[in-house]
Design a protein with these regions (language model features):
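Broad hydrophobic/π-residue packing in well-ordered secondary structure
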Residues: 59-60, 92-93, 161
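A general structural detector for well-ordered alpha-helical segments in enzyme core domains, enriched
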Residues: 19, 46-50, 118, 155-162
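Extreme N-terminal starter segment of soluble prokaryotic enzymes
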Residues: 1-4
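Core catalytic region of metal-dependent phosphoesterases/phosphodiesterases
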Residues: 6-88
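Conserved catalytic scaffold of divalent metal-dependent phosphoesterases
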Residues: 11, 66-158
Length: 162
């Protein structure tokens, strides 16, 4: 199975052409969040339509820079990974969008308790899968992936522990 996952598009789909062959032959595309820059449904739809030109098999979640409307829109489209789990063959994919609180006060920050609840809910849907993939927009705390420009760690302890 070929799964391609990426995030932080922030409405810029110009680089999709660079990975067109990979996108076209993937079994699944996973978008991990930050589809927009503090925008909603209309901008999200543009991003999704751009990806769907290459592959219609998508699972998507919102990021901390997407407004909550994006989360609701993805649910109406039946592709929302946030707090959800999907079986794709023998692979279970579950996720949590948004982010733990940051110094930037972005539109979609959620508590560590909520992150745990969303991850648990999604995991429970795929717990019997042979293989499991956890997709989180917020990185695990105190790792190389959660360091912000001032050197501070801004990731989630819950993601790290899970």
């Amino acid at each position: 199975m070929k799964i391609i996952s990426f995030g932080d598009i922030h409405e810029d789909t110009s680089n999709l052409i660079k990975i067109m062959p990979e996108l076209e032959t993937a079994d699944l595309i996973v978008l991990s969040g930050d589809l927009t820059n503090c925008h909603g449904k209309a901008e999200t739809k543009k991003v999704l339509d751009a990806v769907k030109k290459y592959n219609k098999h998508l699972l998507v979640q919102y990021g901390n820079m997407d407004i909550p409307e994006v989360d609701r829109y993805l649910s109406t489209e039946g592709i929302n990974l946030h707090g959800n789990g999907y079986l794709v063959g023998d692979v279970g994919i579950f996720g949590c969008g948004g982010s733990s609180p940051t110094p930037f006060h972005t539109p979609s920050e959620i508590s560590e308790t909520d992150i745990e609840q969303f991850l648990t809910h999604g995991f429970n849907k795929v717990q019997d899968a042979t293989w499991k993939i956890m997709v989180c927009h917020t990185p695990p705390k105190d790792t190389a992936t959660d360091i912000i420009r001032n050197g501070m760690h801004a990731g989630s302890q819950t993601v790290r522990d899970f």
